[in-house]
From Swiss-Prot:
Record-annotated active site: H278 (proton acceptor)
Gene3D superfamilies, A to Z: 3.30.1050.30, Vaccinia Virus protein VP39
GO terms assigned for molecular function: metal ion binding; methyltransferase activity
EC number: 2.1.1.306
Family to which this protein belongs: Belongs to the methyltransferase OleY/MycE family.
Chain residues that bind Mg(2+): D275, E303, D304
Protein name per UniProt: 8-demethyl-8-(2-methoxy-alpha-L-rhamnosyl)-tetracenomycin-C 3'-O-methyltransferase
Species name: Streptomyces olivaceus
Amino acid sequence: MTTPSPTPPLAAAEVAAAAGLQQRDLLAVLDRVGLEPAVAFLVHDLTARCDTPDNPDAARIGLAVEHSGHRTERVLAVRKGEPVRVDEETAGPPPVRLTFDLADLVRGVYGPPPGPGAGLFRVERDDAWFVKNADDAEPFRIFESYMRAVDVLVRAATSRPGDLGRLAARHASDKWGLWHWFTPLYEHHFARLRHQPVRVLELGIGGYQNPDEGGGSLKMWRSYFPQGRIFGVDYFPKHGLDEDRIHTLQGSQDDAGFLRRVAEEHGPFDIVIDDGSHVAGHQQTAFRTLFPAVRNGGFYVIEDLWTAYCPGYGGAATARAEGRTSIGLLKSLLDDLHYEEWTAPEPAAPGFAAPSLVGVHVYRNLAVLEKGRNSEGTIPFFAPREIDYV
């Protein structure tokens, strides 16, 4: 027996069809239908399209929706092997809340997939709750369960296929869900390489001193690139994670000699990802040493740009990141990208990366650098260098 939608059929159909309208027309439809009826219909359809959850610990996630100064919320119960449903039994606020604008949620559920960098919701997380409810033996288990639960809801709420996000959740990689939201961006840049025999090097494996712990991202990349070879570097030995297409290496990302040996033995690489110590000086050393080891057409990625604002990582407690940090490096790379356009009478020498840097893509806490031949030549000399009519 089919459970009827809690919204009148005509209104429900109108909301679904409105996803393809211009913004002002969509808002007019939502004003006419009303927040509560629209959300009732959306939640009905959203929970019905959710994949079967596989999070080991039961999760309660708030879904808040706002429209025209009004707000409503449902708490969704996400339990392993069960359909996602509205939780009307458990008291207390959920430890994770996703807040959508009503129009964005309508487009997410019924429209085409959004762009990779589209921020469609706000995330609120009660970190104290996770600390209080953590298992001493497995302190991150419940957090990882929530990462998987969030992945199920976000994919249903944004029409994203989310293959890499699903792999991140399966392997407990922090690149998607609660920690970061990187996987749509990675898919955007890496999709053309997916079925090639790529060589991927990631700095930072995770799991701290335990030789058998961590490696979630390495396993995610192994699954995403079926012909790829995945190399991981960590300060601690991680040989317990080695398998057919995953090879771990022990060393410091601040040791240029070690990194050169890695590049000589295992490079050149299609992709290098710096998810290591996040210390400013270490990031600079890794970039200087490993960017040359990326082939033309490949990518160099720096994660966790937030540490540029943290003194404990070599950053500064300021609103403007300094030159020695990852953000400072990216600012200088924008100048280097345009080195052929410099007009100073005696310009300084461009950075070493300038002739082979063809793209700088910066997102929240993530930078993707494209390697290639940056020698297009300057704008023609007869193009005006000044404007005399303003």
